[in-house]
């Protein structure tokens, strides 16, 4: 009798899996742990329930399940949502994933109606739907965070439209720009990032549900109804493609990698600018840390860590590309590995953008240090060359003349603006008394007043444009 009871318990344990009737022995505990995803995919529980409710609504509308079944499913799902919100829902490793955990609890609550929910669908199209629902929400959040970051950058840019700093190429002083102009470069980058995410969302926003395992279903389902209920723009047009590809996730990770690349470039500059050797800015204390041994230290840990996290996001992109490259159609278990990289990419982006929007708005600008740095390195040499061109010289001749002048100034230990009119006319007689205004930092930036230029008036216009674009919804 004891042996029979033990055998029955083993059979019951094996039936924890929805597919267990096909097998003669249960999977090992190690295999359970190895193949289970519930520890990380349970974050999609609300999206899974949304998808299931829309599916149940369609099944009832099509006469595939009864109105009473639908009411029972809705009641059970509301109870499950309440348990999840209260933290009392019991997630079981034996049930593998978020889908089967919720289905098992639903059956416990409403009986056979819960068993009918899975009619006309597979976990293959179910999980693809969950991911798209989740990712759509994440994209909307990230687009708004990019808006906030751009707004913060434009606010500081407007305040510093005329704050002169050196512009660099090869990390060598090149030409004067304004700090506002420099910050607006990042506002442009993050604007394109938002556009990329919005474009990605269009391809995310197609409904896979109804593809079932891979070939569709023989039930008279109405996929368009489900799409409308869940706010999708349409349905995936091929059942094999719907369940097997994750290109929308790869595209999201690629957009995320670009966002983090731009964050990393900004981070590098924040670290450099905050260095005492440069001293262009200071960051608020809440974004910095100290040293356990050196009492004087104020370290820009947030931008440094963001720079490091860029590699993390890039790694998720490569992992997803590698995951997909060798898979035949249709669904393969490999695709279970898509979620952790997607989840971590979204989490990293969300946290990083939230912090940077706050940090950027609190940058303390050290304008005197910026100006002093711009006075070094012959930043207005190009202005002198342009001056000569406007007096009829070919640019290459003007370039050579100014190069000689710069070399002479280096030997004399002075700047071009320090030369007398007579000294300058020795290089070319066309140089007039107006040259010294041309060679000032203010004259240099003011001259670049075309669209996209660094003239303060243009910087103010561009900052105001970005502020208008990013005004709070």
UniProtKB/Swiss-Prot annotation:
Reactions it catalyzes: 2-(N(omega)-L-arginino)succinate = fumarate + L-arginine
GO molecular-function terms, A-Z: argininosuccinate lyase activity
Primary location group: cytoplasm
Subcellular location: Cytoplasm
Annotated EC: 4.3.2.1
Keyword set, alphabetical order: Amino-acid biosynthesis, Arginine biosynthesis, Cytoplasm, Lyase
Cross-referenced SUPFAM superfamilies: L-aspartase-like (SSF48557)
A cellular component term, taken from the record's GO annotations: cytosol
GO BP: arginine biosynthetic process via ornithine; L-arginine biosynthetic process
Recorded metabolic or biological pathway in which this protein acts: Amino-acid biosynthesis; L-arginine biosynthesis; L-arginine from L-ornithine and carbamoyl phosphate: step 3/3
Family from the record: Belongs to the lyase 1 family. Argininosuccinate lyase subfamily.
UniProt-recorded name of the protein: Argininosuccinate lyase
């Amino acid at each position: 009798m004891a042996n029979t009871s033990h055998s029955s318990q083993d059979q019951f344990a094996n039936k924890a899996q929805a597919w267990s009737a096909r097998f003669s022995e249960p999977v090992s505990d190690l295999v359970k742990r190895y193949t289970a995803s519930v520890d990380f995919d349970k974050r999609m529980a609300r999206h899974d329930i949304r998808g299931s409710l829309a599916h149940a609504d369609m099944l009832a509308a099509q006469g595939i399940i009864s109105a009473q079944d639908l009411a029972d499913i809705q009641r059970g799902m509301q109870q499950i949502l309440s348990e999840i919100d209260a933290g009392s829902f019991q997630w079981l490793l034996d049930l593998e994933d978020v889908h089967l955990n919720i289905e098992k609890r639903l059956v416990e609550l409403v009986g056979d109606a819960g068993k009918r929910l899975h009619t006309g669908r597979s976990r293959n199209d179910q999980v693809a739907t969950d991911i798209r629902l989740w990712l759509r929400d994440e994209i909307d959040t990230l687009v708004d965070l990019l808006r906030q970051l751009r707004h913060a950058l434009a606010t500081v840019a407007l305040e510093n439209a005329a704050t002169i700093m050196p512009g660099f190429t090869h990390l060598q002083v090149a030409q004067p720009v304004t700090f506002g102009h420099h910050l607006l470069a990042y506002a442009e980058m993050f604007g394109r990032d938002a556009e990329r995410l919005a474009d990605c969302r269009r391809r995310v926003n197609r409904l896979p549900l109804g593809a079932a395992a891979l070939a569709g279903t023989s039930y008279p389902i109405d996929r368009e109804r489900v799409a409308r209920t869940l706010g999708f723009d349409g349905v995936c047009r091929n059942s094999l493609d719907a369940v097997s590809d994750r290109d929308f996730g790869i595209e999201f990770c690629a957009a995320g990698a670009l966002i983090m690349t731009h964050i990393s470039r900004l981070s590098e500059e924040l670290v450099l600018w905050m260095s005492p050797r440069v001293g262009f800015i200071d960051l608020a204390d809440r974004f910095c840390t100290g040293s356990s041994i050196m009492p004087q230290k104020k370290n820009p840990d947030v931008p440094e860590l963001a720079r490091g996290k860029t590699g993390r996001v890039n790694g998720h992109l490569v992992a997803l590309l590698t995951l997909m490259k060798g898979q035949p159609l249709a669904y393969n278990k490999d695709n279970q590995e898509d979620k952790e990289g997607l989840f971590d990419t979204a989490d990293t982006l969300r946290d990083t953008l939230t912090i940077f929007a706050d940090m950027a708005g609190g940058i303390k600008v050290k304008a005197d240090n910026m100006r002093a740095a711009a006075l070094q390195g012959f930043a207005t040499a190009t202005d002198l060359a342009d001056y000569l061109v406007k007096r009829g010289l070919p640019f290459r001749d003007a370039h050579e003349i100014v190069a000689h002048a710069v070399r002479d100034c280096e030997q004399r230990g002075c700047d071009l603006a320090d030369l007398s009119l007579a000294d300058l006319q020795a290089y070319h007689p066309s140089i007039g008394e107006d040259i010294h205004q041309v060679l000032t930092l203010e004259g240099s930036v003011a001259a670049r007043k075309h669209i996209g230029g660094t003239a303060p008036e243009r910087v103010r216009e561009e900052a105001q444009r970005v502020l208008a674009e990013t005004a709070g919804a």
